[in-house]
């Protein structure tokens, strides 16, 4: 009897964890919140200025090890698909934009890096793990969201990007 109760307790715990994970809020299917952020070149950039293009927004932080892995993959994607209508934007959520800039310089990426030092934009995008990648379609709707990064995730990004570029 006791073993049965313990087993039921574990099963209920597993179900509650699974339910809570599936209930994580997402912006997929909703309009992407617009933002204006300062870029590394000193200009303010707005998401809305890229309306009509597919936009990959990657939220990252220098303290998130997965960001260091993901950025070169995103740079390759940017190089390959930029002329086809893809815009890649990296958004640092580090509080210290100077240290974030040093990190971005060291990563040598060819896409614009923006600074969200107050994390206000990150909150609007419901960030829950770093890095986080969002794909926005040509009409400004969030179509894909991925939290965290492991090698191979960029293949899922590519599938989504190709589909959005065909639309």
Where are these regions (language model features)?
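Structural signature of beta-strand start/N-cap positions in the alpha/beta core
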Residues: 53-55, 85-87, 112
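Positively charged n-region of N-terminal signal peptides that target proteins for export
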Residues: 1-4
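Bacterial N-terminal signal peptides
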Residues: 8-18
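Hydrophobic beta-strand core positions in alpha/beta domains
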Residues: 56-58, 88-90, 134-135
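Structural microenvironment flanking redox-active thiols in thiol-disulfide oxidoreductases
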Residues: 68-107, 117-124
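N-terminal "domain-start" segment that seeds a small globular fold
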Residues: 20-47
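Thiol/disulfide oxidoreductase modules built on the thioredoxin-like
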Residues: 102-110, 116-162
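Short active-site neighborhood of thiol/selenol oxidoreductases, capturing the structured segment around
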Residues: 48-65
């Amino acid at each position: 009897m006791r073993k049965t109760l313990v087993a039921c307790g574990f099963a209920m715990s597993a179900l509650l964890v699974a339910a809570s994970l599936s209930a994580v809020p997402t912006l997929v299917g909703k309009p992407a919140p617009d933002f204006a952020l300062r870029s590394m070149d000193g200009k303010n950039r707005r998401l809305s200025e890229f309306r009509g293009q597919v936009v990959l927004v990657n939220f990252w932080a220098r303290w998130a090890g997965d960001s260091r892995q993901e950025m070169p993959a995103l740079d390759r994607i940017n190089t390959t698909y930029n002329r086809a209508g893809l815009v890649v934007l990296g958004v640092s959520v580090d509080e210290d934009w100077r240290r974030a800039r040093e990190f971005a310089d060291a990563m040598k990426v060819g896409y614009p890096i923006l600074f969200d030092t107050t994390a206000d934009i990150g909150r609007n995008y419901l960030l829950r793990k770093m890095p986080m990648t969002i794909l926005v379609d040509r009409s400004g709707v969030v179509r894909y969201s991925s939290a965290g990064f492991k090698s191979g995730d960029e293949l899922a990004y590519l599938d989504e990007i190709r589909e959005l570029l065909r639309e």
